[in-house]
Structure formats: C-alpha cells, structure tokens
Design a protein with these regions (language model features):
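Short, low-complexity N-terminal tether/leader segments at secretion or assembly junctions of large
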Residues: 1-33
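Collagenous Gly-X-Y triple-helix signature in extracellular proteins
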Residues: 36-296
Length: 296
C-alpha cells in the first residue's frame, strides 16, 4: 500500500497521496544526507553536466550554462563539491590530463573590492595539476620562484605577482584550457600583501594593495585553513575568507599557496603532504600547483 496512488470506487479513481508532500519529504531526506556527508568531508560531489543535463541543452555547453546561472544568482541545486571535468590537451608547458574542477565557494567575495565584485563561483581542482616543459622540475612539479626570496621589488612589491607560479598560471595554464572554459572565467582582483623595503629584506609585510591576479590564481592560506598559520594576519590576510570546500583538509597532497611566510625573508606557504599548513623555500622542487578560477 505504500506505493498506492489511487483507489477505485465504482469505476471512479480517487487520489490517496499528496505527491507534493512526498516530493518535499524526499528532497528533505536528500538534503539531510548531503549535509551529513558534507559535515564529515565525505560528500563525493556530482557531475553537474549529468545532474543538469536537460537544462544545459538550452546552452552551448556546461560552462555557458554555469556562467548564466551565476550571473542570475541562481544557485538552486548546486552544491559545494559538485564538479565539472575539464580535459586539457598537452601543450608546451602543461601535461595532458583531465582536471576535475569542483565548486569550492559560492559568492565568497560578492560586493567586495575597490570595485564591487559581481556574483561568482570559485572553481577549485580536486587535486594538483601536472606541469611540463621549461618550468617543470622533477618531471611535473614547479618551483614557486627560482630564487630563495619571498620579497617584492621596487617595481612590483607583491611577491606572488613576481612568482614563476603566477606566471605559469596565467601565461601557460590559462591558454591550455578549452575555449568554453576560458569564456566563462571572471578575472580576480584581491587585496594582496606587499613586502618590500629599499633598506633590506623583510620578514613582515610592508603593506597591501588592490591587485589583479588575472584569470588563474593560487589559493591563499586563509582560503584553505580559515586562518594565518605561517602567513601574517592583517596585511597577509587581505579580504580573504575560508572556502567551504576546505572545512575538511583530508587530502594528503602537496601544493603551493600564494601566501608568503611571516617569519622568514625567503619561505613561502604551501599545503603539506600530511594535510597540514606548511612552508618551503620557493625553490623547493617537489610541489605542484592547484590553479583556481572564478566563473561569473
């Protein structure tokens, strides 16, 4: 009887269910299970191209659909951890690979900035990306910088913007992405740490400034851990906030952050292979990038 929908009395059918109530109850159970899995870091994510296949048919591709959804601030049904697979062909500087880009945060910086930022979704790769060519070390890794120095210069006071990592992200990885992905990306402007003095190397930030990161960028320590572990509070934090996808830092992979260490004139921040907040010399050659972008 649990699946019965009608009774027939003298040839007349009478509904005995409230389908709307059943649908709402089913959705509530699904949402509760999602919340449980998300709270313990066990939500595997869903392929957005499959979940919203019928809706996506109205657009040229899944990325055009996602961008339209974001611009209308329609996030219905989209969950942190849901993903889109991106097939990247081999280029001179990027290895052939499929990168699973997950929803890492929804509108984390909406209306923030010296120019207010519009609606956006931060897309974060589920794992690191393999490098090749002149910038690759140990086959597929990359140095943050070729010198053991985390300071800026008189011309560019922000250390990250001087890094080999940032150059590779915007000059090589961006162009390796399929055209439909590139078309959906919003440039990212942030409040970035400066570290420069004409009198010598610094172990502390010297200030901050609004800077364009371009379309591809590495995460900050705060965006991953929600706090400053090795980077400095204040100038080293800017307007950053933790991305919900990193409430559980269970992954044992080693990857670079854009933050620099607050207790050294040479070290930069990274996520250690034990899942811990860590630091390394920028010349260390066993760390990979985890390049992110905004859709909007």
């Amino acid at each position: 009887m649990a699946d019965a929908k009608t009774f027939n009395v003298n040839g007349a059918n009478y509904s005995i269910i409230d389908q709307t109530a059943r649908d709402n109850a089913s959705k509530a159970m699904q949402d509760a299970e999602y919340s449980r899995l998300e709270s313990i870091g066990a939500y595997p994510g869903r392929d957005l191209a499959t979940v919203f296949a019928e809706e996506i048919k109205q657009k040229a591709n899944v990325w055009e659909w996602l961008r339209a959804r974001v611009r209308s601030a329609n996030y219905s049904g989209i969950r942190i951890g849901d993903y889109i697979d991106v097939v990247i062909p081999q280029t001179a500087q990027v290895a052939s690979q499929t990168v699973r880009y997950a929803v890492g945060a929804i509108d984390p910086y909406y209306q923030c900035g010296d120019t207010a930022k519009g609606h956006h979704i931060a897309m974060v790769p589920k794992s690191t990306v393999a490098v090749r060519g002149p910038n690759a070390v140990n086959d597929s890794y990359i140095q943050w910088r070729k010198t053991a120095d985390n300071n800026g210069t008189n011309e560019q006071k922000c250390p990250y913007l001087l890094s080999q990592l940032h150059e590779w992200e915007n000059e090589h990885f961006l162009s390796a992405l399929p055209a439909e992905v590139q078309a959906a990306i919003m440039p990212h402007r942030v409040l970035l740490e400066e570290r420069y003095s004409s009198s010598g190397k610094l172990t502390e930030p010297s200030g901050w400034s609004w800077q364009d990161l371009g379309k591809i960028w590495s995460l900050s320590e705060v965006e991953v851990y929600g706090l400053n572990a090795w980077s400095k509070p204040g100038y080293g934090t800017g307007f950053d906030c933790q991305f919900p996808i990193f409430k559980q830092t269970k992954d044992r992979i080693h990857w670079w952050l854009r933050s620099v260490s607050g207790s050294s004139s040479s070290d930069v921040c990274c996520v250690g292979s034990y899942g811990i907040a860590y630091y390394n010399s920028p010349t260390y050659d066993w760390v990979r990038p985890r390049p992110c972008f905004l859709v909007g």
